[in-house]
Amino acid sequence: MASNKIIGIDLGTTNSAVAVMEGNEPKIITNPEGSRTTPSVVSFKNGETQVGEVAKRQAITNPNTISSIKSHMGEAGYTVEVDGKKYTPQEISAMILQYLKKYAEDYIGDTVTQAVITVPAYFNDAQRQATKDAGKIAGLDVKRIINEPTASSLAYGLDKKDKDEKILVYDLGGGTFDVSILELGDGVFQVLSTNGDTHLGGDDFDQKIMDWLIDGFKEEHGVDLSQDKMALQRLKDAAEKAKKDLSGVQEAQISLPFISAGENGPLHLEKTLSRAQFNQLTNDLVERTKQPVLNALKDADLTFDDIDEVILNGGSTRIPAVQEMVKELTGKEPNHSINPDEAVALGAAIQGGVLTGDVKDVVLLDVTPLSLGIETMGGVFTKLIDRNTTIPTSKSQIFSTAADNQPAVDIHVLQGERPMAADNKTLGNFQLTDIPAAPRGVPQIKVTFDIDKNGIVNVSAEDQGTHKKQNITIKSNSGLSDEEIERMKKDAEEHAEADKKKKEEVDLKNEVDQELFQVDKTLKEVKGKVPEDDIKKAESARDELKKAKESGNLDEMKAKKDALNKVIQDLSVKLYQQAQGAQGGAANGQPGDSQQNGNDNGNDDNTVDGDFKDVTPDDKK
């Protein structure tokens, strides 16, 4: 019989860890080699699959070794080929998860089938789906996907449930950097904002040392070690060791005998790297982490004075220069009470305990990293869920058709921060068909966005008249890449003014279209009920607005629109006065037949015109 325990897994880019609740405390489970973390590396050799330290030791010398597969999670079409067989990132990740699962089972003494797995805060919908799929392949029922900084805060906050605090989590791992602002209070953990750099981590610090060693050796001996795979493997191991040593000592000795051979025999590499030199080599990497911290604070609408605690997470935060920079930037001494390599897995185990009921009075509220919405009339991106909204969440809005007798609508689902649909990322498209024939603006189509506890998106559209419904779950091949998230955030900042102007232009054109449509409808209704001169005056004002629209001159469009509005208002007043006169002349004071104001089209004021494509029966499949 399988254990009911839910293990917590930190599936990292460079290293992974697994933990489980024992009593009221989370505990890291050591791997068969006695280490508390396991390298996220898989190698294939002689038909055998190897995971962890043994695979890492052959990362460069064995071409069938795969590292940092996490950076490709959710990437559509990406595969690695080994001995003629192609593997997806989910399959490689599943091999790492299976290894963690196996030694967790050995420790617990029972079969494990359930897990909570962590992901970087910036992982999008596709990447979260891919992580869940990897768990399924590994034989795990993934009960929850949670953000890494959130998990580490959960580990930190377990003993501080009676405190109300705002926490900044600085998470510098092997391959990614995340910063999150969280609020703790009454056992509730709420993420206020997230930010980061998805291509920055400890591997970059190792590479700086490797480049320094390679350049120095080439200058001294005229030999380029970057062309020698065996030498590169030794350099990589030595660079990582030197980096770790420099967290505790001022100088690191790097000794690699027989690293290469020259005309006069074997060549040896002997170097001393001081902490000051290391800081100089890696200063640009440390500086790159500052802006995401400032961005996260800005998104949370906070200052450093509002922050109560600063937590360091990820093995790379052991670097003294990183700790010093965080202290200077925030003005606060970072909290070192949690092992930065283990905090995420511990937090995941606590979340597992919450789900099984072993841990009580703790609620975890995560957020969605980017805004979600659909394309509406004029190519506008209409947001339904803003970024940094707490999940799980659901939001609905009523939309309508853009043409008379429109039989179907296309729902274009988007993710991003720009006002225009074309500048954001398409997540998916689906169609709602068999809409009864009706004038534009009459059908009421309810679009609903649901984001579940794992951050996975479901979108539905329902015709409120027929209750016909269509929906889509965003699949993993339609998500954003890390670069796209960063590009979209930067684009949103750089093009803010131009975007605002473009959106105002589209909004005005949409208003003009709606005005012209409504005026034509009103003029038909009042014909014969008001003087012909008034009708002609309104038609003339309408034609002037049409000309202004064709010219594209925004100022002229505004002026002509206002002029037409005034004419129609005057027309409505006369119609109303005539109706009152008819009412007064009715027998025994009975009301006469009053005409509705021509500007009432029977729509809710909050209804948004959708840019829904007209689909003829021939187009339907």
From Swiss-Prot:
State the UniProt keywords alphabetically: ATP-binding, Chaperone, Nucleotide-binding, Phosphoprotein, Stress response
Induction data: By stress conditions e.g. heat shock.
Kindly give the CDD domains that the UniProt entry links to this protein: ASKHA_NBD_HSP70_DnaK-like
For this protein, the record's SUPFAM superfamilies field holds:
Actin-like ATPase domain (SSF53067), Heat shock protein 70kD (HSP70), C-terminal subdomain (SSF100934), Heat shock protein 70kD (HSP70), peptide-binding domain (SSF100920)
Q: Identify the stretch(es) annotated as Disordered.
A: 476-508, 521-559, 578-621
Q: Which Gene3D superfamilies match?
A: 1.20.1270.10, 3.30.420.40, Actin, Chain A, domain 4, Substrate Binding Domain Of DNAk, Chain A, domain 1
- Which InterPro entries does the protein's record reference? ATPase_NBD (IPR043129), Chaperone_DnaK (IPR012725), Heat_shock_70_CS (IPR018181), HSP70_C_sf (IPR029048), HSP70_peptide-bd_sf (IPR029047), Hsp_70_fam (IPR013126)
**DNA-binding recorded as keyword:** no
Enumerate composition-biased segments (Basic and acidic residues).
Answer: 486-508, 610-621
Q: Which GO terms describe its molecular function?
A: ATP binding; ATP-dependent protein folding chaperone; unfolded protein binding
A Pfam family that the UniProt record links to this protein: HSP70
- Superkingdom of this entry's organism? Bacteria
Please verify whether the record's keywords include Protease: no
User: What residues bear Phosphothreonine in this entry?
Assistant: 176
Q: Where is the composition biased (Low complexity)?
A: 588-601
| Family label | Belongs to the heat shock protein 70 family.
Its biological function?
Acts as a chaperone.
Q: Which HAMAP family match?
A: DnaK
Q: What is this protein called?
A: Chaperone protein DnaK
